[in-house]
Amino acid sequence: YEAIKNIKKELTEKPLIGFSAAPWTLATYYIEGNITKDLSIIKSFSYKNSKEMDFIIDLFSDLISQHLINQIEAGVDLIQIFDTHSYQMDYYMHQKYSTRQVKKIANSVRKKYPNIPIIYYSKIFQFLDKDVNNYLNCVSINSNISLKEQKKHFKSDICLQGNLDPLLLAEGGEYMVKEIKKILLEMENNFFIFNLGHGILPQTPVENVFKLVETVRSFKKKV
């Protein structure tokens, strides 16, 4: 948490985002080690050892809640919860190990810091509660989903974040600029934060990142 304090001293007026993996995603690394393509190891474990799995997920939820609270106390201005591997679950498993746990974490954090903005990232959203806006401020969308179509599934006060393909940022060029503007135009009259659909790739040239920022900040709709 000292790193957060030191970074905040340098950022001054710029917001700093804290983050953590969600319980299910954290558990996939804990149980599987090297992640299998279909998460067969952790899913098999959860079927055969439901009590142990419940204990692990509940424990991780409590630890993540405290970890995020510690980040807020160190100076972050908002938090993001990443549930990268939740898309491999069916509806009932998702409700038990993802949706309920994310709500639990959000409520725990909000109990102490009621005004802290919370962003949630997943690759699947049809399993989220209809009252998601009661505990999340923003939903981060991956590159395989249309932002415009996804917006229809949420109430108007939910912010969406995303969703340029990270590989496109790594490639750069005019097509990247075209796709950035396409996303911006599509989401113009909505609560929206431009971002990638997943993490930035290691091979991404820094000049491409500068170009992305420049394009977003200078964007104006053509009348």
Feature roles, as predicted:
Residues 2-223:
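Active-site loop segments of alpha/beta catalytic cores
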